């Protein structure tokens, strides 16, 4: 008998360890020799790992160490430089078990680099999942594939983190709740004419104290992939009780989806780095790598086979 939504297990437990194991199996099955780290880029907002065959991986940087950007003799700079030349799998394995947020972020970036050749839509489909890919200039972007395929006007949606997704979701669901660690006034605009009104409209802002209740009662929950870096992913998934769908979004989500979809995530929306030369050039000259990735690399939406079942087209 098919399991009901309430019976579907959403645990998020050791998902990175299982993903690394699956990556190892894919490399062995396809007789591919894994690369070593050829370059690391550190930015206050992101970390990048480049492999020796120009594989590119990116992850959110949630650690704070201003000295890295001004003192090339800083012990941490020297320590991180020591990772260059090591196997990507070693950086990933050591980092995901580390309590050091910088190492954990670099581990996810290394896993992202290792994942790239298995993120193509044809490769994902061969492994039994639905996949859709597009570029920023494609018409499909205007149709918001995630929204049109998965979210209905009757859904109560909870978004963790105030992201551009909030703008796209406005008007496409019954209610949109956004939970962010920053105070709600960070995102508010006061509009003054003959009256006083406040924006954004149609978005209900919440503090993190309200997280369990908001995520526990929503129909669709969207979790940032940056939660993999600070190790809050499992906690967020465990807050979900009622949701029909749980989605993962963001740059850190550029990982093979297999284990996430087995552990209770229903869909992932992220990016595949299929123009490495543009990516490598930009990482040195453009601090807004999120926009670079959004505009120059391939977007993807990966889903469980029945994730969009029952959604009106």
Predicted region positions:
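Conserved nucleotide-cofactor-binding alpha/beta core module
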Residues: 172-217
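Residues in the short beta-alpha loop(s) of Rossmann-like NAD(P)-binding domains
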Residues: 163, 182, 252
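C-terminal functional extensions of proteins
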Residues: 235, 245-313
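Structural motif
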Residues: 158, 220-224, 247
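Short beta-strand/loop segments at the ligand-binding rim of alpha/beta enzyme cores
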Residues: 175, 198-199, 239-248
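Electropositive, gly/pro-rich neighborhoods at or near active sites that engage anionic ligands
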Residues: 2-172, 300-313
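Short, conserved loop/helix-junction motifs that constitute active-site signature segments
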Residues: 152, 168-173, 215-216, 237-243
């Amino acid at each position: 008998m098919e399991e009901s939504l309430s019976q579907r297990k959403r645990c998020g437990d050791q998902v990175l360890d299982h993903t690394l194991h699956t990556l190892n199996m894919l490399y062995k099955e396809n007789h591919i020799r894994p690369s070593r780290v050829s370059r690391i880029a550190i930015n206050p907002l992101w970390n990048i790992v480049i492999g020796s065959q120009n594989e590119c991986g990116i992850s959110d940087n949630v650690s704070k160490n201003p000295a890295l950007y001004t003192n090339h003799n800083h012990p941490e700079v020297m320590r991180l430089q020591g990772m260059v030349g090591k196997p990507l799998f070693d950086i990933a394995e050591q980092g995901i078990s580390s309590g050091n947020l910088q190492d954990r972020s670099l581990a996810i970036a290394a896993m992202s680099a290792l994942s790239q050749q298995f993120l193509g839509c044809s490769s994902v489909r061969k492994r039994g999942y639905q996949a859709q890919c597009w570029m920023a200039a494609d018409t499909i972007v205007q149709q918001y594939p995630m929204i049109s395929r998965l979210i209905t006007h009757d859904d109560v949606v909870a978004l963790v983190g105030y992201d551009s997704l909030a703008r796209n979701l406005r008007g496409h669901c019954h209610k949109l709740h956004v939970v962010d660690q920053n105070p709600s006034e960070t995102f508010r605009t006061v509009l003054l004419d003959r009256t006083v009104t406040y924006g954004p409209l149609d978005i209900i802002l919440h503090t993190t104290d309200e997280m369990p209740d908001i995520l526990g009662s929503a129909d669709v929950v969207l979790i940032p992939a940056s939660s993999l870096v600070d190790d809050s992913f499992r906690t967020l998934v465990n807050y979900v009780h009622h949701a029909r769908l749980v989605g993962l979004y963001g740059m850190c989500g550029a990982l093979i989806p297999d284990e996430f979809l087995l552990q209770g995530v229903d869909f992932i929306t992220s990016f595949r780095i299929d123009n490495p030369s543009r990516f490598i050039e930009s990482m040195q000259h453009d601090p807004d790598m999120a926009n670079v990735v959004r505009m120059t690399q391939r977007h993807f939406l990966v889903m469980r086979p029945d994730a969009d079942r029952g959604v009106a087209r």
